[in-house]
Amino acid sequence: HLQEDKKCFICDSEDPFHDTLNPDSHRIENVVTTFAPNRLKLWWQSENGLENVTIQLNLEAEFHFTHLIMTFKTFRPAAMLIERSSDFGKTWQVYRYFAYDCESSFPGISTGPMKKVDDIICDSRYSDIEPSTEGEVIYRVLDPAFRIEDPYSPRIQNLLKITNLRVKFTKLHTLGDNLLDSRMEIREKYYYAIYDMVVRGNCFCYGHASECAPVEGFSEEVEGMVHGHCMCRHNTKGLNCEQCLDFYHDLPWRPAEGRNSNACKKCNCNGHSTQCHFDMAVYMATGNTSGGVCDDCQHNTGG
């Protein structure tokens, strides 16, 4: 830190941070916001001199992600990007690029202004070398400048839905001495360090739940944790209420839309079966009123 007399410390992150026993531990869990009075005593710190560094959050279920606020102990990155995955890390899409010099760091990427809420641009507002500490990088998934006509549309829902969030730092800010002297000891003066990383969102239930519980196998005692197992209603089931309950396949599964619950509907098998499946051809043939087909009919019945 430029304002401190002593500039070099030996870090030991083998054990978690402790105010007195291990104050020089800088593990990634230190970025979890506590809002405690001593929050500036702990931070995450990257390896010295390394420019390409990644922080990845792997969530236990689908979530609605709304915004990210990162508070840095060091200079903010000269270049970075935020990415998302909605299929547990199989594929990734860029949310936004950030750079002091967008054209140099991310050539070919528009610098805006945004024309649509899902435009991918490079933002220069959060990449200045000043302040040298406690500078923020802020990202909102839905820019308040855009009026969202239908928040339940697939386009908006897909923008919000994540299972993984990845922040890639690609360029360090330096004071220029590394350009005159390429020795490792010069480069090692620079690194990324973060006090807080606030990730805001809520459990993702397609409108079929109003509360969430802990996912099986995950701790429920983490303070402030948003749980990922939806307490499903409207005859739905699954971690995210993404399926109809068994024997509720008379209508296709749909997400709720505003005041319309789009609840799954029970099949009508006249008491001769407890199993059914949805058939789109049957649904369309009935004028989109009933698509449930009874399976394993009993009592000498069929159809």
UniProtKB/Swiss-Prot annotation:
Q: Where's it mainly located?
A: secreted
Keyword terms? Basement membrane, Cell adhesion, Disulfide bond, Extracellular matrix, Glycoprotein, Laminin EGF-like domain, Repeat, Secreted
Instruction: Give start and end of each Laminin N-terminal domain.
Output: 1-202
Instruction: Report the SS bond pairs.
Output: 203-212, 205-230, 232-241, 244-264, 267-276, 269-294
What are the GO MF terms of this UniProt record? extracellular matrix structural constituent; integrin binding
Pfam families from the xrefs? EGF_laminin (PF00053), Laminin_N (PF00055)
A cellular component term (GO) from this record?
perinuclear region of cytoplasm
Instruction: Give me the glycosylation sites of this protein.
Output: 52, 288
Give GO terms for biological process: animal organ morphogenesis; axon guidance; basement membrane assembly; cell migration; negative regulation of cell adhesion; neuron projection development; positive regulation of cell migration; substrate adhesion-dependent cell spreading
Asked if the Swiss-Prot or TrEMBL record annotates the protein with the keyword Secreted, the reply is: yes
Any idea where this protein resides? Secreted, Extracellular space, Extracellular matrix, Basement membrane
Q: Answer whether the UniProt record assigns the keyword Membrane to this protein.
A: no
Q: Where is this region: Domain V?
A: 202-303
Q: Note the superkingdom of the native organism.
A: Eukaryota
Whom does it interact with, and what assembly results?
Laminin is a complex glycoprotein, consisting of three different polypeptide chains (alpha, beta, gamma), which are bound to each other by disulfide bonds into a cross-shaped molecule comprising one long and three short arms with globules at each end. Beta-1 is a subunit of laminin-1 (laminin-111 or EHS laminin), laminin-2 (laminin-211 or merosin), laminin-6 (laminin-311 or K-laminin), laminin-8 (laminin-411), laminin-10 (laminin-511) and laminin-12 (laminin-213). Interacts with ITGB1.
What does the UniProt record say this protein does? Binding to cells via a high affinity receptor, laminin is thought to mediate the attachment, migration and organization of cells into tissues during embryonic development by interacting with other extracellular matrix components.
Q: What protein does this entry describe?
A: Laminin subunit beta-1
Q: Which organism is it from?
A: Gallus gallus (Chicken)
